Design a protein with these regions (language model features):
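Short alpha-helical segments and helix-capping/turn motifs at coil-helix boundaries
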Residues: 48-53, 67-77, 84-87, 163-165, ...
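Thiamine diphosphate
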Residues: 134-165, 174, 178, 188-194, ...
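Non-catalytic, alpha-helical, charged scaffold/linker segments
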Residues: 328-404
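Active-site nucleophile and cofactor-binding loops and adjacent substrate-binding regions
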Residues: 51-63, 89-95, 148, 157-178, ...
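Glycine- and acidic
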Residues: 23-29, 44-54, 82-87, 160-169, ...
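Cofactor-/ligand-binding subdomain signature composed of acidic, glycine-rich
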Residues: 1-45
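Cofactor-binding active-site loop characterized by glycine-rich and histidine/acidic residues
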Residues: 27, 31, 39-44, 49, ...
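Non-catalytic terminal/interface segments that mediate subunit docking, oligomerization
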Residues: 34, 377-551, 625, 635-669, ...
Length: 796
């Protein structure tokens, strides 16, 4: 019995059944073929002279696909890489960076030869042939030509330090999700007149689970401005048969790329020979004309390492040995055609491997080869002129489109204006003492306040936990239901494949990177902190590469149901470890964690974090109801004090004795409601500090840090935390203090299930246990009493 897909909004098109006429004339085809020869030759040069580093195979097999996108499909302006209305190309396959850099440099040469007016006026907005001297080089490289030509240090996987690159990619599958996030940002900002996002990836990069999650999200949301280009060469690092093909099972997966995309309601265009420019461009033009309202994938059957001399998986991250016969054979076609003579060494040794100047010799040989390639391109002016004209046409098409933001488009600048000008907590967010609420609910209300002020600049998703984590509040007042590009564009709630923290973080990072939204994702802190970490880290890398000193495009990962008060769910969910994955694990200023204990601290902390414009904000909020304390009556610092990151929660009534540092809401409530009254009953008078954000504290001037939390306090402190012990090491400096610090794993085991108070008691973190621990610690801090000296009778 044959099986088939159920009804789909999308189409599956086999190019060989379309009878599409060849899109290129014989002369045009010759120009594309010449460009590809330059490209394949340059990939061989890059691998040889780095030396022996990079990914030649997939770079070569995707070259013709990318050439079609850049010189035929995209509407963009080479002279203005930052144009927001332009189509985007996004290398989800970050390991094809060699190909990206080679194509960018050759495109720059095409424009330089054919029409220099096409180029950016600022050389920093170009990727020149000379910049290839920086391929996989560190920024502090000092070789002569790198310095002379001010070459860019081109990372092994692409970052936005390179013009026209919007994301950092390379961690498999993350680039797919973040590229889809870019498309989401463009589609929501521009509406139907949206830029297209062309995504480049191979079938190996489709195998991570986060990819299926992201494809499901895009298909469900009818994200029709995505065109996904799959370089299906069947070769990964370890396999030459990744997917099932015909009757042969795949070694990794049992789907073809066409089936995977169509399963998720994507249009599919099947290209039998991805080495044929006529088929490549015909498929791309068909994609441009589809009107199904669904995203599109073009799957090209290719050969990894084609014409390089090494094919399949052997060419993935490896190539010919340095200046070997295989290397020269890979360049033989270009050398014969252009009359080039590449640098070579006499005898059996390589000059670059001898003596202290080897790196300089290698660089000189590389530059010599690049100059010969440049001359070959200059001698082939018809190719440069033909492709240069196509670059000019791409700019003209873009200008004719006159893309503008849709009516009522979100205004992200209003969010940052709001938190900059707000004087204290807005009236509608203020909480009276005695109010019963949750941290998560107040975070939802605070973010909704920002969303209303910005006409919906916050798009929110959750791992099937919208109401449970209170982030549904953020989207209230906009369109009901889930966002859909055509059917429900006013909604602010995203459907991201269901329980999909991994893809959610990736999509939200791309959404933020487009620059017009703040993406908010929510789940249990136990899950979203680890599963969102890779996407958040790549987002921070990309943000800092683009703007080394900030400000950065912000995404928010809500680590909800945090800590031991989620105890009924057991240790799989009530996880103390989540904070340690994020806190202080990013370069300063790129990420900010928030650990409020009192719902009144939510707005001050959120506003302080947003003012700093980090790439990531990660609030840790608990699940159960709490009673808002009367801080003034209790002698506690006001909630606004939390914005310093560390603050003196309770000032001693006298001289003070010992220091206690607290972090996490459950243990803070236990201290305030139970331990503190017992300490005061006994006349014990410690300094009590609370850690509300380690990163906000780090961003204070050094002298302010010393004032807020003097070093002598850390040297005498003990800690009480609902997170893991290492999160206290910064604040508790002595061995004695660390040994006395209370934390969930002090007993050496994962905790059991039960209501929050029971789990706290099991951990020794309830108020009574805190009181006993603090009392005992203060006693150990006190110097022993001086013994009176008694004179012996003989000396009397």
């Amino acid at each position: 019995m044959a099986t088939a897909f159920g009804p789909r909004r999308a189409r599956w098109i086999r190019l060989d059944e379309t009878q599409a006429p060849p899109p290129l004339s014989g002369e045009e085809l010759a120009r594309f073929e010449a460009f590809d020869l330059f490209y394949r030759s340059l990939c061989a040069l890059l691998y040889n002279y780095v030396p022996q580093s990079g990914h030649p195979g997939g770079s070569i097999s995707s070259g013709r696909i990318v050439a079609g996108v850049l010189f035929d499909a995209m509407d963009y302006d080479l002279g203005r890489p930052e144009r927001e209305d332009a189509d985007i190309i996004s290398y989800a396959a970050g390991h094809k960076a060699m190909g990206l850099y080679a194509t960018w440099a050759l495109r720059d040469e095409v424009a330089r030869i054919a029409d220099p007016a096409l180029l950016p006026a600022d050389p920093r907005c170009r990727l020149r042939l000379e910049d290839l001297l920086g391929f996989r080089r560190n920024p502090i490289t000092t070789t002569p030509l790198f310095v002379k030509h001010r070459a860019k240090a081109l990372d092994g996987h692409p970052t936005p330090a390179t013009p026209f690159v919007r994301l950092s990619t390379g961690a498999s599958g993350v680039g797919v999700a973040s590229s889809i996030g870019l498309a989401l940002g463009a589609r929501d900002h521009y509406g139907e007149a949206t830029p297209r996002v062309h995504v480049i990836e191979g079938e190996g990069g489709l195998t991570p689970g986060r990819v299926a999650e992201a494809l499901a999200a895009a298909g469900t949301a009818s994200l029709d401005n995505v065109v996904f280009h799959v370089d299906w060469n069947q070769a990964s690092i370890d396999s030459n048969r990744v997917c099932r093909e015909d009757s042969r099972p795949g070694e990794y997966v049992q789907w073809t790329p066409m089936e995977l995309f169509h399963l998720h309601d994507w249009n599919v265009i099947e290209v039998g020979d991805g080495r044929d420019f006529q088929q490549v461009l015909a498929a791309q033009r068909i994609a441009a004309g589809l009107t199904t309202g669904q995203p599109t994938a073009i799957v090209y059957r290719t050969v990894k390492g084609w014409q390089y001399g090494i094919e399949g998986r052997a060419s993935h991250g490896a190539g010919h040995k340095l200046c070997s016969d295989g290397f020269y054979h890979a360049l033989a076609e270009l050398c014969a055609r252009a009359g080039l003579t590449l640098p070579s060494c006499e005898g059996s040794g390589h000059r670059c491997e001898m003596g202290r100047d080897g790196a300089t010799v290698m660089e000189e040989c590389f530059y010599d080869a690049l100059l010969q390639l440049r001359k070959a391109m200059e001698d082939d002016r018809p190719t440069a002129q033909a492709l240069g004209a196509r670059l000019g046409a791409a700019r003209e098409r873009l200008n004719r489109r006159r893309r503008k933001p849709r009516p009522g488009a979100p205004r992200i600048e209003a969010v940052f204006g709001l938190v900059t000008t707000a004087n204290g907590t807005p009236a509608e967010l203020r909480l009276a003492p005695g109010t019963v609420t949750t941290l998560r609910a107040e975070l939802g209300r605070a973010l909704q306040h920002c969303n209303k002020a910005s006409d919906g600049a916050l798009l929110v998703g959750a791992a099937d936990l919208l109401g449970s984590t209170s982030v549904n509040t953020i989207a209230a007042g906009f369109g009901e239901g889930y966002w859909n590009a055509s059917a429900n564009p006013a909604a602010r709630t995203l459907s991201i494949g269901g329980i999909c923290e991994d893809a959610m973080a990736g999509i939200l990072s791309g959404l933020a990177s487009f620059g017009r939204h703040i993406g908010v994702g929510s789940s249990y802190g136990a899950f979203i902190a680890p599963l969102g970490h890779i996407a958040a880290r790549l987002h921070a890398i990309g943000a800092q590469a683009k703007a080394p000193r900030g400000p950065y495009p912000t995404m928010i990962l809500v680590c909800a149901h945090a800590g031991l008060k989620t105890g009924e769910d057991g240790p799989t969910h009530a996880d103390p470890q989540a904070l340690q994955l994020l806190q202080e694990n990013f370069p300063r200023g790129t990420a900010i964690t928030l650990t409020p204990w009192d719902p009144q601290e939510i707005w001050p902390l959120l506003a302080a974090a947003l003012r700093r414009r980090p790439a990531l904000i990660a609030p840790f909020v608990t699940r159960p109801n709490e009673t808002v304390p009367d801080r003034a009556k209790l002698g506690l610092a006001p909630p606004e004090a939390a914005t310093s990151g560390v603050y003196l929660l309770r000032k001693p009534k006298g001289r003070g004795e010992g220091t206690v540092v607290i972090q996490e809401s459950a243990v803070a409530y236990a201290f305030v409601e139970q331990a503190l009254p017992l300490l005061e009953r006994d006349g014990l008078d410690p300094w009590v500090y609370y850690v509300s954000s380690a990163e906000l504290f780090d961003l204070l001037p050094e002298e302010e840090q010393d004032r807020v939390f003097p070093e002598e306090r850390a040297r005498e402190a003990m800690g009480i935390t609902g997170f893991t012990l290492p999160t206290m090491f910064r604040w508790v400096r002595s061995d004695l203090g660390r040994a006395a610090t209370l934390h969930p794993y002090r007993g050496g085991h994962y905790l059991g299930s039960g209501q929050g108070p029971m789990v706290l008691a099991e951990a020794g973190l309830d108020g009574e246990a805190q009181y006993r621990a603090i009392r005992g610690y203060l006693e150990r801090l006190r110097p022993p009493p001086r013994r009176k000296r008694v004179l012996s009778r003989s000396k009397v």
